[in-house]
UniProtKB/Swiss-Prot annotation:
Alphabetic keyword roster: Cytoplasm, Secreted
Localization terms from the record: Secreted; Cytoplasm
Gene Ontology biological-process entries: negative regulation of execution phase of apoptosis
Tissue spec. comment: Expressed in mature brain, thyroid gland and testis.
Protein's recorded name: Humanin-like 10
Species whose genome carries this gene: Homo sapiens (Human)
GO-annotated cellular components: cytoplasm; extracellular region
Induction info: Down-regulated 6 hours following staurosporine (STS) treatment and up-regulated 24 hours following STS treatment. Down-regulated 6 hours following beta-carotene treatment, while it is up-regulated 24 hours following beta-carotene treatment.
Gene transcribed to yield this protein: MTRNR2L10
Domain of life: Eukaryota
Amino acid sequence: MTTRGFSCLLLLIREIDLSAKRRI
């Protein structure tokens, strides 16, 4: 996996985590 793809994946996980916290 490339560094760019990894950071992109990390960003996606962060977005999901934030939206999950917002729901609660």
